[in-house]
UniProtKB/Swiss-Prot annotation:
Keyword flag Transferase: yes
Protein name (database record): Homoserine O-succinyltransferase
GO biological process: homoserine metabolic process; methionine biosynthetic process
Organism: Acidithiobacillus ferrooxidans (strain ATCC 23270 / DSM 14882 / CIP 104768 / NCIMB 8455)
Annotated AB hydrolase-1 domain residues: 51-360
Reaction catalysed by this enzyme: L-homoserine + succinyl-CoA = O-succinyl-L-homoserine + CoA
Pfam families: Abhydrolase_1 (PF00561)
Record: active site: S157 (nucleophile), D323, H356
Pathway where this protein functions: Amino-acid biosynthesis; L-methionine biosynthesis via de novo pathway; O-succinyl-L-homoserine from L-homoserine: step 1/1
Record has Acyltransferase as a keyword: yes
Family: Belongs to the AB hydrolase superfamily. MetX family.
A cellular-component GO term for this protein: cytoplasm
Positions bound to substrate: R227, D357
Gene, per the UniProt record: metXS
């Protein structure tokens, strides 16, 4: 918890909620009988309502992108390093909005929410949701906030996929699209990682076919394993070598057993056990499926340039050299497709050793690229 809030922080923030009562038609063919979104805002919306930027979060992220909910918080929001007064995403120039997407578990409607027809949690009766569905709800949130056009839509990882979907589905509603550490679709290997994670959850004896809420339990072992597997893919080999090497826990000798010997084992177990306390297992299943299904080019016979042909936004695409989950090669696919359809696109490959999680870190070159680009956006709109 902070002794005092840093001057360059957005400070104390309060989540807000909005409930939409009209049925939401989903890409899977089903619908939700209304839904709730939880979101946060940072900065001030100008009189012209032209300085709004939408932030799209990743798999385990949420609406809390920066600042603190109380002085008791152990740590600030997930993009604290980049979002705040005078930072790369400058709250003195822009008004930022970040919403928890449906299917998640941080306040927006998801599997743990109450099904109005049964009075019990949805569980696996919750309909499948997709990136396109998330973008649709974000557009409804923009309408609610009176924002006709975003100055930019920005997102990393799964958030970057939402940015791409925004540019295709609502081309007239964003001026700039910032796609960070993302891919135009998952590879077979990435789908395989997600499936192993899902199986870890679904084969846990405490899963109860997704109805573990009624049993006052949760699939702790399965969700913990899923997080451990996922976390390995977010880090590079060099990052793990630098952080852990083959160091034993506390420098002790081998136990010659199956308890924790190495620091990296201790780290992964901590990541797994702490994740269980803050995330819902069913949400993890739904979100990873949405990741798997994302493939906007499939509508166009696999031609990504055709998928981008209707876009109007200017693009900034950023990748990280050590990211093997969504490698620079995947970002270059996006850039090439945008070039092919004559879109304005800037590209930066950032040298970083942190792997996929680099998009969350204050790497100087990354900060400079983002700050310069958004600075030009601010000048363009007179912010």
């Amino acid at each position: 918890m902070p002794v005092e809030i840093p001057a360059d922080s957005v400070g104390l923030v309060t989540p807000q909620t909005v409930t939409f009562s009209a049925p939401l038609e989903l890409e899977c063919g089903r619908s939700l009988p209304g839904y709730t979104l939880t979101y946060e805002t940072y900065g001030t919306l100008n009189a012209q309502r032209s300085n709004a930027i939408l932030l799209c979060h990743a798999l385990s992220g949420d609406h809390h992108a920066a600042g603190y909910h109380s002085m008791d918080d152990r740590k600030p929001g997930w993009w604290e390093h980049l979002l705040g007064p005078g930072k790369a995403m400058d709250t003195e120039r822009f008004f930022f909005v970040c919403a928890n997407f449906i299917g998640s578990c941080k306040g927006s409607t998801g599997p743990a929410s109450t099904n109005p027809e049964t009075g019990a949690p949805w569980g696996l009766d919750f309909p499948m949701v997709t990136v396109r569905d998330w973008v649709k709800t974000q557009a409804e949130l923009a309408d609610y906030l009176g924002i006709e056009q975003w100055a930019a839509v920005v997102g990393g990882s799964l958030g970057g996929m939402q940015v791409m979907q925004w540019s295709m589905d609502y081309p007239e509603r964003l001026r700039h699209a910032v796609v960070i550490a993302a891919a135009p679709k998952l590879t077979a290997q990435n789908i395989a990682f997600n499936e192993v994670c899902r199986q870890a959850i679904m084969t846990d004896p405490e899963f109860y076919n997704g109805r573990y809420y009624a049993h006052n339990t949760k699939p702790r072992r399965g969700l913990s394993l899923a997080r451990m597997i996922g976390h390995i893919t977010y880090l590079s080999d060099n990052a793990m070598r630098t952080k852990f090497g083959r160091d034993t826990r506390g420098g002790k000798a081998f136990s010659f057993g199956f308890d924790v010997d190495f620091e990296v084992e201790s780290y992964l177990r901590y990541q797994g056990s702490s994740f269980v306390e803050r995330f819902d297992a069913n949400s993890y299943l739904y979100i990873t499926k949405a990741l798997d299904y994302f493939d906007p080019a499939s509508t166009w016979g696999g031609n990504l340039a055709e998928a981008f042909a209707s876009t109007r936004a200017n693009f900034l695409v950023i990748s990280f050299s050590s990211d093997w989950r969504f490698s620079p090669e995947r970002s270059r696919e996006i850039v090439q497709a945008l070039y092919t359809c004559n879109r304005d696109v800037s590209y930066a490959e950032i040298e970083a050793e942190h792997g996929h999680d680099s998009f969350l870190m204050p790497i100087p070159q990354y900060v400079a690229v983002l700050s310069t680009y958004l600075g030009r956006v601010a000048e363009e709109i007179g912010a």
